């Protein structure tokens, strides 16, 4: 059971899951319930559809367990007001080599997220995988964030480099699996202490800095570019490609995409969006894809001209819509976690 890249043939994968309509009625006003419950219904349908597609493509699919809460959970120093469903496994979990890395972030609504994945990871552990976790942090509410963020141009860096600088917190979605190396946005989101924890639990020199012009070592790295084999990169434009991959064969595909439309978030749902997430970034959902193998890639939208172009290069494109991806801040790659791929550890990045 191992994973060394983002593109070796996928054998086992986790697909996130969502609450059903009515599960969160206890914290949603009567006025907003019809709209929000429809959003839950469609999100669950989309995730189930993605899981079915992956099964059709030959992967074994695992789903997290849903735990239902009926009230906020008070933990003395902070309260988990709305424990969200395990929709996005990519942010706090990484399977690299034969080890499961479990982290914590400033996202209070995902504080108990690990419970949902416990059975899956325990089975991997029983079958020989290693499983390690960051210590549980002591967080605090930031509902009055405007009082302390007014003087900072970047809330995310403020959260992790100042407010939580001494906490072990890390977003695993900052890391791109590339054989012997994890190409990483080393500034976060996540604290430098959290990065140090990752470094100490990995072989020496595994982590290499992304240094891409577009991301400047900040943000989730699983968009803007993807690879289909050891030597081929597809990207919005070269500015998203990490410096250590600039010598690969690079295909810029921005011209094939229509402008991304901002999805309108239902008014008065702001209380469901945690200001303390510490993750500010413009995300290219068009390239937040799951590479099933070097010849099959899953997108969340259909792009006929792009798909024809990729087919001419030997890559078949599949579509699994995510109708509310903007609300959940999650594309296809975000809502999945590859836990087994057929391939060996190898040197892919030549200049480190």
Please state what every model-predicted region is.
Residues 1-352:
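The feature marks the mature, well-folded catalytic cores of soluble enzymes
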